[in-house]
């Protein structure tokens, strides 16, 4: 059944951030068992998103006044990151898609007018799947004004995750004056062209991140979200990296769990070298888990939660988020190598899950500008005469 026709779940009006996190925790094993069935080019975890809808998780990032659980609000960052981690532990492709849904809901609640927020919140409550399609190549999206106040889209987006299944993508496009404008496109009313042959990836095959040609589609002025340039407003643009890092930590946890299961199954738990590797892997997993809590606490530190866009707070929040994504990337890469050595060639054969987990996490770790992110954290440390005991706390 298409996501856009799903009925609202009664659970979504009963949830709190704690119960939303608990729902994701409960779903993780089912997501993991189901993951192989959508792991093919052109696949999509349709059934899994039905489960998320039934659990109220598609509406959970909405404010409580809009019928959600408030999971997307600043004081609930740790519950949100934990929810993303649990979903990523179940299936990284589902985690990637859900993170995009969360991002879109946060963006329209932050930058939308009251009437727009109510309209798009109703769509989320009705089961529509949102996403964010920003990446583009040379033929990027342009907005052409029409005489009737509408706009015609020209151009394409690459990596349109959930293409063909996301019914409310949040897009960005260039206005004639060069401004970068957000919009939310109602895809149950008109369809773009999907280039499915574009998506032949190493991993994350089930995310259906096709190239999307939007040329010729028209939108109303009411579909525009916020002012030009709002999409890149800090700290939210770069600071949002903590969300995908949380999903990545979940993927690392899945690899850890499967490694210990495999070693128990083959009777290698007494091997001193396996124990040493598991000790190293435990250290890495704990590091990722501690960083999730640290990231949430940093966002809520005095002043930053109430005045996040003040330059002094925004700059620090972005630098800390860049630290987190860098640490998580490093620990995941190290953990992947340790897991490979633990399970050997035998463990990398299907139907063991390591081959899929390795592909998915390796691919998902390739986020934009990793070197620049770490360099920015170093720049921040050099630009501010703050002692180490206060710099990142």
Residue ranges, per PLM feature:
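A generic N-terminal leader/anchor concept
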Residues: 1-79
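Amphipathic, well-ordered alpha-helical segments in soluble domains
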Residues: 27-30, 251-258, 284, 291, ...
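C-terminal helix-coil-helix/basic helical segment that borders enzyme active sites and/or dimer interfaces
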Residues: 32-40, 264, 287-327, 340-348
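Glycine-rich flavin
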Residues: 44-54, 58-161
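A short core secondary-structure module
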Residues: 159-194
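Glycine-rich beta->alpha junctions and the first turn(s) of the following alpha-helix
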Residues: 201-286
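Generic structural signal for well-ordered, non-transmembrane alpha-helical segments
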Residues: 250, 279-286, 322, 326-333, ...
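Glycine-rich phosphate/cofactor-binding loops in nucleotide/flavin-utilizing enzymes
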Residues: 345-393
């Amino acid at each position: 059944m298409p996501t856009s026709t799903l009925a609202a779940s009664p659970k979504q009006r009963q949830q709190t951030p704690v119960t939303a996190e608990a729902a994701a925790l409960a779903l993780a094993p089912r997501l993991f068992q189901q993951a192989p069935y959508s792991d093919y080019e052109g696949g999509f975890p349709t059934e899994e998103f039905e489960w998320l809808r039934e659990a109220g998780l598609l509406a959970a990032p909405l404010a409580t006044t809009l019928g959600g659980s408030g999971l997307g609000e600043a004081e609930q960052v740790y519950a949100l990151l934990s929810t993303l981690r649990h979903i990523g532990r179940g299936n990284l492709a589902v985690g990637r898609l859900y993170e995009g849904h969360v991002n879109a809901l946060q963006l329209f609640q932050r930058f939308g007018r009251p009437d727009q927020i109510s309209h798009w919140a109703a769509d989320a409550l009705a089961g529509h799947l949102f996403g964010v399609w920003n990446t583009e190549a040379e033929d990027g999206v342009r907005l052409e004004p029409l005489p009737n106040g509408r706009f015609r889209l020209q151009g394409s987006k690459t990596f349109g995750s959930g293409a063909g299944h996301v019914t409310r993508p949040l897009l960005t496009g260039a206005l004639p004056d060069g401004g970068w404008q957000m919009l939310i496109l109602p895809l149950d009313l008109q369809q773009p062209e999907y280039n499915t042959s574009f998506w032949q990836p190493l991993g994350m095959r089930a995310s259906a991140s096709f190239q999307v040609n939007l040329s010729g589609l028209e939108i109303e002025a009411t579909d525009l979200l916020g002012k030009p340039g709002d999409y890149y407003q800090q700290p939210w643009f770069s600071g949002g990296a903590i969300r995908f890092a949380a999903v990545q930590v979940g993927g690392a946890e899945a690899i850890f769990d499967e490694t210990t299961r495999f070693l128990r199954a083959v009777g290698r738990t007494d091997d001193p070298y396996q124990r040493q590797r598991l000790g190293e892997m435990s250290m890495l997993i704990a590091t990722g888990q501690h960083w999730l809590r640290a990231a949430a606490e940093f966002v809520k530190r005095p002043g930053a939660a109430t005045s996040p866009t003040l330059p002094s707070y925004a700059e620090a929040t972005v630098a800390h988020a860049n630290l987190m994504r860098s640490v998580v990337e490093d620990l995941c890469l190290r953990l992947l190598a340790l897991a490979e050595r633990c399970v050997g060639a035998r463990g990398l054969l299907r139907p063991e899950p390591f081959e899929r987990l390795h592909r998915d996490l390796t691919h998902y770790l390739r986020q934009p500008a990793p070197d620049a992110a770490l360099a920015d954290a170093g720049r921040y440390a050099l630009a501010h005469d703050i002692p180490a005991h206060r710099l990142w706390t």
